[in-house]
């Protein structure tokens, strides 16, 4: 894994597809005019080869080659499992 590979963390919001999970990653962006930090949420489609993620899990995922039109990320590690 090179240093330029993007690693992100997010919470799994859907596991309805085979070998794919939908992850929501939050980030804070400063408003250009008012200066307040606003929470932004981005939805990522992540490749989960063994279907090991459950809804609510917090995972770490990295950018990789495109698996499909929308899926360009793959699972690295499950940080916290939802009970």
Curated annotation (Swiss-Prot):
Keyword vocabulary terms for this entry: Ribonucleoprotein, Ribosomal protein, RNA-binding, rRNA-binding
Role summary: One of the primary rRNA binding proteins, it binds specifically to the 5'-end of 16S ribosomal RNA.
Protein name, per record: Small ribosomal subunit protein uS17
Organism from which the protein derives: Francisella tularensis subsp. holarctica (strain LVS)
CC per GO annotation: cytosolic small ribosomal subunit
Quaternary structure, from the entry: Part of the 30S ribosomal subunit.
One biological process term in Gene Ontology: translation
Family statement drawn from the similarity comment of this UniProt entry: Belongs to the universal ribosomal protein uS17 family.
InterPro entries: NA-bd_OB-fold, Ribosomal_uS17, Ribosomal_uS17_bact/chlr
GO MF entries: rRNA binding; structural constituent of ribosome
Ribosomal protein listed as a keyword: yes
Taxonomic lineage of the native organism: Bacteria, Pseudomonadati, Pseudomonadota, Gammaproteobacteria, Thiotrichales
């Amino acid at each position: 894994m090179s240093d330029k590979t993007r690693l992100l963390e997010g919470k799994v919001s859907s596991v309805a597809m085979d070998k794919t999970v939908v992850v929501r990653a939050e980030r804070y962006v400063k408003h250009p005019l008012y200066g307040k930090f606003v929470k932004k949420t981005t939805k990522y489609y992540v490749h989960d080869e063994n279907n090991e993620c459950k809804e609510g899990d917090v995972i770490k995922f990295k950018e990789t080659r495109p698996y499909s039109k929308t899926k360009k990320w793959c699972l690295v590690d499950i940080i916290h499992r939802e009970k």
